Amino acid sequence: MFLLTGYEYFLGFLLIAAAVPVLALVTNLIVAPKGRTGERKLTYESGMEPIGGAWIQFNIRYYMFALVFVIFDVETVFLYPWAVAFNRLGLLAFIEALIFIAILVIALAYAWRKGALEWS
C-alpha cells in the first residue's frame, strides 16, 4: 500500500501553484515588446498630460495614520472569529481575548499620546 495516500492531491496542487507564476513570467518575457523608447517612457495619467513632478513628498502623518488604521483593522480580523465562537471557547479564551484587547488599548493610548492620531 502507498503510504502517501491523500497527499498526492496536495503535491499536485503545490506543483501547479509553483508552475503558474513561473509560466506567467516566462510568457511575459517571450511575448512582451522589447525596448522602451519615446512615448513608452512617458508617464500615463488617465489619458491626460501629467501635471507637476512625480516625486512628491507626503507628510509623515499620512503614513502614521495609515499604519494605525492597518493595526486596528487586523485587530478586527482577529476578534471577529473569536466573537462568533464566543459561546464555545470558554473562560480561558475570554481571558486571552481580554489580554489581546488590553495590549491594543495600550497601543492606542501610546499612539494617541505620541500624536499619531492628530491631523492638524
Swiss-Prot record:
It is found in: Cellular thylakoid membrane. GO terms for molecular function: NADH dehydrogenase (ubiquinone) activity; quinone binding. One of its GO terms (cellular component) is plasma membrane-derived thylakoid membrane. Its EC number is 7.1.1.-. The chain crosses the membrane at residues 10-30, 64-84, 89-109. It is a multi-pass membrane protein. GO terms for biological process: photosynthesis, light reaction. Keywords: Membrane, NAD, NADP, Plastoquinone, Quinone, Thylakoid, Translocase, Transmembrane, Transmembrane helix, Transport. It is an enzyme of class 7 (translocase). InterPro entries: NAD(P)H_OxRDtase_bac/plastid, NADH_UbQ/plastoQ_OxRdtase_su3, NDAH_ubi_oxred_su3_sf. Its main location: membrane. It catalyses: a plastoquinone + NADH + (n+1) H(+)(in) = a plastoquinol + NAD(+) + n H(+)(out); a plastoquinone + NADPH + (n+1) H(+)(in) = a plastoquinol + NADP(+) + n H(+)(out). NDH-1 can be composed of about 15 different subunits; different subcomplexes with different compositions have been identified which probably have different functions. NDH-1 shuttles electrons from an unknown electron donor, via FMN and iron-sulfur (Fe-S) centers, to quinones in the respiratory and/or the photosynthetic chain. The immediate electron acceptor for the enzyme in this species is believed to be plastoquinone. Couples the redox reaction to proton translocation, and thus conserves the redox energy in a proton gradient. Cyanobacterial NDH-1 also plays a role in inorganic carbon-concentration. Belongs to the complex I subunit 3 family. This is NAD(P)H-quinone oxidoreductase subunit 3.
